[in-house]
Amino acid sequence: MNIIEVNNLEFEYRTYDEDGNVTECNKVLKGIDLEIPQGQFVAVLGHNGCGKSTLAKHFNGILSPTSGKVFVKGIDVSDEEHIFDVRQTVGMVFQNPDNQLVATVVEEDVAFALENLGVPPEEIRRRVDEALKTVNMYGYREHSPHQLSGGQKQRIAIAGVLAMCPDCIVLDEPTAMLDPKGRQEVMKTIKLLNSQGVTIVLITHYMDEAVQAGRVIVMDDGKIIMDDVPKKIFAQVEKLKAHSLDVPQVTELMYELKKSGVNVPVDVLTEQECAEELLKLKHGKLTAKKEEEKENTSGINSEVAAEIRNLTYKYSVGTPFESTAVDNVSLAINKGEFIGVIGHTGSGKSTLIQHINGLLKPTSGEILINGKNIWDKDSDIRAVRFMAGLVFQYSEYQLFEETVYKDIAYGPKNMGLSEEETDKRVREAAQDMGLDEELLNRSPFDLSGGQKRRAALAGVIAMKPEILILDEPAAGLDPKGRDTVLDEIYEYHKNSGTTILLVSHSMEDIVKYADKVLVMNRGRLFCFEETDEVFSRARELEQVGLGIPQITRLSHILAENGMNLGEDIYTIDRAKKRILEIINA
């Protein structure tokens, strides 16, 4: 039996003038036909703007079709008389858990929808307890949601939907803002619910999540272009990449080996599958050679750009909620370095970086920029913020001006620069971030997601900070958009010599770009070393709630079975090179 049926669905967003006349139409869904059987686990992939979220919002009646029909258990979602039946059948979980939590106590938040439905108190108590136990959060029922980690908050959001006893849960990028441990927690919950018969529709940009589904749908330009089991979808590497999508690292490794003439299947999805196939190959022995260090193209020197001395920061000092976010951290960052900053949610990463440009003032300790304490009485904290630029996660929320040009120019103008110098910096920053000249006169709110992100970055770069701090600059972008933004940042770093601090939950991105990695754990500095050195401690990283690249996990499995690629396998290219050396030895 199908729980969701979509027949020739079309939807367009419309812009109206003051008189209610349509001034602009943007068709987002174009003739979608889809059936989802009860109990299925479906992953939906597609680049930003392809229509994934718009389609999902039709499943529980948040949006109504412009034309065509959507049925949930035979009920037309356009039928307003039965809209509450639809929404009780299909629950929805969004990307940002903070936008979904409404109460000050966990169990009250989970009970919120049930109270609105008029469910008897005894039944509310039973359902709330059951939902919290299902997502393994019963022990936190009396906690305040804002004190929980991202993964815990998202599980509370899922519990709130689960308490309504839906037959289907639609999750729109529920792990986009989570660390690796948080992602694992949420995916474990999703799979558990599916095993209990709940239909799951998961929208994601993470391919390792999509491979866990029973069915994968790929969208592009408002249409479904691929629909099959994960093995058959991800075996089509070139087609997926042409649509701005990625494949699991092990799938891409096998694809690259096959292109090099090695007889291996491409439709592998997990490290275990990949290892089994590689171990079948006849191979000689190879003494693993450590890869040469990355070429220094960024002008790193021993001159210190920023120094942190015995930094401690506490939130809510003097209240029952007092907590230490950063605990006695000391480190020095040299000029021209590209530093990756990693750590589990709540480890203190964001709190730490917000001290470098003076957004937060230490409870104790010192922050020095170019050898000068930024909180000395004679220090100009405003000037410090021009020297150390900070770009927040979802930086498009920093856009506010009428045009892209004015938005980028805002910082230089506030620095007191001349009109001529401001214009020069705006155009240079736009070029550095890959923004075409024609976009400068457009409203920033008319840009695509990736363009908005680059415009916000350009606004900080235009001030030419000596230190550029980036908090998850690629969060929420599709694989192609993510690579474009990060490549442009790296090119800017190489050309300008600017010191970069990149906060990320993607170990693959950190490995690709960072010279050194700063690891935070529970408010303390876990380690701060060269990238290769940090990721050679892969098992320790996993113990502190961090992920390691899938390709690294593969190398560990191979080593345990006699095929030693070395301790420094973090990229597909390096793994491919070592495997070819071994099988040809």
Residue ranges and their predicted role:
Residues L45-H47, I342-H344:
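The feature captures the beta-strand-to-loop junction immediately N-terminal to the Walker
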Residues N60, N357:
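Helix-to-loop junction immediately C-terminal to a conserved catalytic motif
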Residues K69-D85, E366-A383:
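ABC ATPase NBD Q-loop/coupling interface
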Residues E122-Y140, E420-E438:
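Conserved ABC ATPase "signature" region
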Residues S144-L148, Q152, S443-L447, Q451:
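Conserved ABC ATPase signature
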Residues C165, K464:
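Conserved catalytic motifs of ABC-family nucleotide-binding domains
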Residues I169-D172, L468-D471:
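Catalytic Walker B motif of ABC-type/P-loop ATPase nucleotide-binding domains
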